């Protein structure tokens, strides 16, 4: 299985759907779904996903290189792994999504959207995770969901962690730092993301890794993510990662800006970078007689997008943690 990405993009089912490789067994579970199981018993399970948004190609190319290393035998596998390419049709078309944003649909929220390829895919991915986690007895469960941002950022690489009732494990946060993440953003409320679903329903330690900016296939400079690729390789092979890194800055979400109608106006231009700071009292957005302003001494914007569909998030405002 050395052509997983090509088969997924072409919508082709391989003639052989399972087999053995260097130290592990593999199974094709469907387009964009590949299960890897080490020959030796392991108590660790990992979801490694990318392409939930079809225009975010750098992480997909990174996963393709990791799979090539595993199947060539140059990289050892020490986790049960489910590799997920989230939205194959959007990836093939080079667009963010075909109908609706899948990363708002998980946890059954797909039922509130008009039926589409994305709603069906969200349901399929939910069932795939349920099957994957229920078929093993993993003591450790991780989910790394790889993305790129629409906009540039003051932090080239950062992580977004879902709301979680239990404390985050220090080794997981340390690995995120070793993977080159410059900042970690902690959600304070539930959401429809893939990472929130895996965390809430299966107790996985989950993070969306935002790596650079969205570009078409073959236009990505993957060298800027070498530290992340090396950390992923070390993780898969069970090798300790370096501890000589600066701890990521930490932020928490303090509010969400939502577009409700065509009267919505977001007062940030197209050049506003993620993590741009705004002082207390700054007018951020207006919609009719509703005004959104900064309420803390300093807040930082994340994912500003004035053209989202009505009812969706047009941005998050963050507060820096000590």
UniProtKB/Swiss-Prot annotation:
Annotated keywords: Arginine metabolism, Hydrolase, Metal-binding, Zinc
Cofactor binding remark: Binds 1 zinc ion per subunit.
Catalytic reaction(s) noted: N-succinyl-L-glutamate + H2O = L-glutamate + succinate
Pathway membership, UniProt: Amino-acid degradation; L-arginine degradation via AST pathway; L-glutamate and succinate from L-arginine: step 5/5
EC number: 3.5.1.96
Annotated Pfam families: AstE_AspA_cat (PF24827), AstE_AspA_hybrid (PF04952)
Protein residues bound to Zn(2+): 53, 56, 147
Cofactor(s) the record lists: Zn(2+)
GO BP terms: arginine catabolic process to glutamate; arginine catabolic process to succinate
SUPFAM superfamilies with a match to the protein in the record: Zn-dependent exopeptidases
GO molecular function, one term: succinylglutamate desuccinylase activity
Active site: 210
Similarity remark: Belongs to the AspA/AstE family. Succinylglutamate desuccinylase subfamily.
Function: Transforms N(2)-succinylglutamate into succinate and glutamate.
Protein name according to UniProt: Succinylglutamate desuccinylase
